[in-house]
């Protein structure tokens, strides 16, 4: 799949994954339209990181959409009465940091935007190996949403569908960090932590997964 001279809407949260997707798209000479969401998340610092990444890669357009999912809560990311789990990553259950329907809502907005500007792709930073077990980051979810997208808009019905582009889907976090360096992502400007603090907590799932992968990448590169 070539992205050169193609238009792509990237869901840019400001985290490691979405920033890496943006970097890959930039290196591929795509026309990039970034979308970020102010959805009532406690870690609003990611919005600042998203803006910095958008400027770093000089993308064609960047929008922050106000869409307050904290109105009904259901997640420790949008409800400050719930504690963010810090006991370590658990693989046998979906953690309370899962935001009900978040990816479905965000990708739907991106699909509408992409169709309006006649973009060819929607870039997503989802990955199914090193993640917190969210149901909307898995390959079967992406496959089914693509099927929905093909049916749900004019371009799909005219056999010119907008494609979901998920270059990180089958990669682990260490591989993503390597890709980030290869594509000139300023990792120190990205934000992964779920806490609303000014510095990463180092204890939430997102911090633990990222830090462990970075340590592994560092160790492997020091051996070379």
Curated annotation (Swiss-Prot):
GO BP term, pick one: queuosine biosynthetic process
Q: Which residues cross the membrane?
A: none
- UniProt keyword annotations, A-Z: ATP-binding, Ligase, Metal-binding, Nucleotide-binding, Queuosine biosynthesis, Zinc
Q: Which domain of life is it from?
A: Bacteria
Q: Which Gene3D superfamilies match?
A: HUPs (3.40.50.620)
Q: Which GO terms describe its molecular function?
A: ATP binding; ligase activity, forming carbon-nitrogen bonds; zinc ion binding
Gene of this entry:
queC
**Protein name, per record:** 7-cyano-7-deazaguanine synthase
Q: What is its EC number?
A: 6.3.4.20
* Function text: Catalyzes the ATP-dependent conversion of 7-carboxy-7-deazaguanine (CDG) to 7-cyano-7-deazaguanine (preQ(0)).
For activity, the cofactor(s) needed are: Zn(2+)
Detail which positions bind ATP: 12-22
Report the top EC class in one word: ligase
Report the sequence similarity comment from the record. Belongs to the QueC family.
The record lists the catalysed reaction(s) as:
7-carboxy-7-deazaguanine + NH4(+) + ATP = 7-cyano-7-deazaguanine + ADP + phosphate + H2O + H(+)
According to UniProt, this protein's pathway is: Purine metabolism; 7-cyano-7-deazaguanine biosynthesis
**Which classification does the entry list for the species?**
Bacteria, Bacillati, Cyanobacteriota, Cyanophyceae, Synechococcales
